[in-house]
Amino acid sequence: MSYSIGIDYGTASGRVFLINTTNGQVVSKFVKPYTHGVIESELNGLKIPHTYALQNSNDYLEIMEEGISYIVRESKIDPVNIVGIGIDFTSSTIIFTDENINPVHNLKQFKNNPHAYVKLWKHHGAYKEAEKLYQTAIENNNKWLGHYGYNVSSEWMIPKIMEVMNRAPEIMEKTAYIMEAGDWIVNKLTNKNVRSNCGLGFKAFWEEETGFHYDLFDKIDPKLSKVIQDKVSAPVVNIGEAVGKLDDKMAQKLGLSKETMVSPFIIDAHASLLGIGSEKDKEMTMVLGTSTCHLMLNEKQHQVPGISGSVKGAIIPELFAYEAGQSAVGDLFEYVAKQAPKSYVDEAANRNMTVFELMNEKIKHQMPGESGLIALDWHNGNRSVLSDSNLTGCIFGLTLQTKHEDIYRAYLEATAFGTKMIMQQYQDWHMEVEKVFACGGIPKKNAVMMDIYANVLNKKLIVMDSEYAPAIGAAILGAVSGGAHNSINDAVDAMKEPILYEINPEAEKVQRYETLFKAYKALHDIHGYKKANIMKDIQSLRVEG
């Protein structure tokens, strides 16, 4: 009997799972919030701009070391039988390190400098740099831009590097290496400085055939090309391959065999496809969490406007992986719950339920459109299909009779409408959607939301029993790297998580949602394209950081 470890680094917490490679059984698990959380308003008591989202890399080592030690001890499994370790990570979450690959935020002189810290995926401080990168690419007719949805996001690696070059050159001067946090964890495990094709391909303008797009970087700033060449470029390891064995010292520290193999890191949402078994084309998978990723696989590379990228072999060898997404989903619902009136909070407490459960109870019998509300879910910008992190959310139809649960439902529906925009974009560009999978912690807990999604999308919705699908997907890659399975497909068939339930759309609800969706799309186009300056002008009055 052999086992594999999956380490899943999310936005707010980390998870370490020990998985049976024969049947996918979870033998042991460890879950812990990051000690320093997400650093968004203050760093060591100093105010930071509202567009920033930072983390402390020491939290990642804490998860890895405490988590692996715990599952080995708790499971009583002989470490010799743990054949592989896989890692998934939020992306683009990047780390700046010294020549010893130690993060520069640990240097005393940079303790209070926000640019020395990990730039989390949802850090939007590089929006000006992203715009410059985009405009330069458009002006020079870079054909490969279509592989990234004809857009550049401030969430990606290169704009974040440009941000540090422009605003904290002293940090860049002390930086020897820049890498995805997932690559950094792989380095700590193996002592090898390599890069995953998944992370580079989706977040750093790197392609298997051509490498980095230095022609574009040179036109922006020759110094940028040199930074990428000297500090980012490294040997690339593809998903499905092995980086190598555990470093001897790390094996001893973690209580594992030094023969344990380590796979390259995979982006967290992408790992979910493996965890639930969505490994074919014509299947769209929604990974619902803090944000939502909408993923598809296809034999061909289509240039789909408004998506976040398409990369060959980033999930399954030889297939192109496509990613689109929404920047605020779980975060948005959490925001609404925190605004609940005290009477709702008290009622939920008295009935021994959460505020979410209370609001779901209040809305579950409402018909679509009953509240008279419709919302734009852009509270953290719009990733797809508008690709504009500076857009903000709106809600329409409020009256003095509007209740808090009506607002909550409007936001549930808004995220479903945003998903429909993405699904239609895929379909308009020759990628048929026959099945829709939903995975992550939210679908398992919120049947009301899943009913809304099935009827808005007008598709059978397959809800997976997969609160921890990324960790399972990471463990699958660990199993392949350790030789427990001959291929990713074989490992997926053996280890994937089961279906929880399926929902079929209802004709009356579908019809009502079609009417609402037309209104959503009209508002989407007005505030996203035609009159986008209205909300941006209001935002410009905020204090600049």
From Swiss-Prot:
Kindly tell me the pathway this chain contributes to: Carbohydrate degradation; L-arabinose degradation via L-ribulose; D-xylulose 5-phosphate from L-arabinose (bacterial route): step 2/3
Got any disulfides in this one, which pairs?
none
InterPro entries associated with the record: ATPase_NBD, Carb_kinase_FGGY, FGGY_C, FGGY_N, Ribulokinase
Question: Into which EC class is this enzyme placed?
Answer: transferase
Residues in the signal sequence: none
Instruction: List the EC numbers from the record.
Output: 2.7.1.16
GO terms of molecular function: ATP binding; D-ribulokinase activity; ribulokinase activity
Taken from the UniProt entry, a GO cellular component term is: cytoplasm
User: Which keywords does this Swiss-Prot/TrEMBL entry list?
Assistant: Arabinose catabolism, ATP-binding, Carbohydrate metabolism, Kinase, Nucleotide-binding, Transferase
Biological processes annotated in GO = L-arabinose catabolic process to xylulose 5-phosphate
Q: Which reactions fall under this protein's catalytic activity?
A: D-ribulose + ATP = D-ribulose 5-phosphate + ADP + H(+); L-ribulose + ATP = L-ribulose 5-phosphate + ADP + H(+)
Q: What family name appears in the similarity comment?
A: Belongs to the ribulokinase family.
Q: Which NCBIfam families match?
A: PRK04123.1
- What name goes with this protein? Ribulokinase
